[in-house]
Swiss-Prot record:
This is Tritrans,polycis-undecaprenyl-diphosphate synthase (geranylgeranyl-diphosphate specific). PROSITE patterns: UPP_SYNTHASE (PS01066). SUPFAM superfamilies: Undecaprenyl diphosphate synthase. It holds the Pfam family Prenyltransf. GO terms for molecular function: ditrans,polycis-polyprenyl diphosphate synthase [(2E,6E)-farnesyl diphosphate specific] activity; magnesium ion binding. It is an enzyme of class 2 (transferase). It comes from the Archaea. The gene is uppS. Homodimer. Keywords: Magnesium, Metal-binding, Transferase.
Amino acid sequence: MSDIGNFVSRIYESKLLEEIKKHPVPGHLGIITDGNRRYARSIGISENEGHVKGKEKLEEVLNWSMEVGIHMVTVYAFSTENFKRKSDEVNFLFNLINDAFIDLLNDERVYKNGIRVKVIGDISKLPDYLKETIKRVEGETNKFKNFRFNLAIGYGGRQEIIDAIKKIGQDILNGKIKVDNINEEMFRSYLYDKTLPDPDLILRTSGEERISNFLLWQSAYSELYFADVNWPELRKIDFLRAIYSYQNRKRRFGE
């Protein structure tokens, strides 16, 4: 892009940010970070390098989220389906996620901004070193309340619902609850994190238009926005457009 083009783009971005700050933003933003591997192939780097670029982009997007006033972000970091990838890639991703958590533990912005870090999903299949790091970062940030950063790891929406049903069934057999007592509020209490509110907006990159087993129970009335760029290529202007689009919709919640 030319210098003039960059100048015009910065002005547009500034004006859009100014407009966004005048109106309510999503309280909870869900993000499906799709396109790391496609990005890598498109510029001739390894897929692992593409994942590293994706990690770097996530740091940017968290900053953008706090800048516009969003207080909760949930990122689809590693799905149950991702376990089916080649073992070398899976192990690389586990190490990359572990590094990301360690970076958070050492990042003064986490403590300055009061960022609580939480993991949702079935972590039983994760390597011990990663489970230990998750325990550390969750414990270290548990007291913070200003901003919440959730990572869905070992997560699948269908599996979450199945696991909830199994736990409910067991409690019925044990006489702890009655079938007639089951309602949406009770069901939510059996999900991986009963404190997780429904996402107001789900942003997906790469141009794919589906939610891919992400927060299936919680996303019943979420607004969806699909950005036609791979995750590492997401620009601040793309992010702001997603928020602006959300602000200009009339949410009906099924009515």
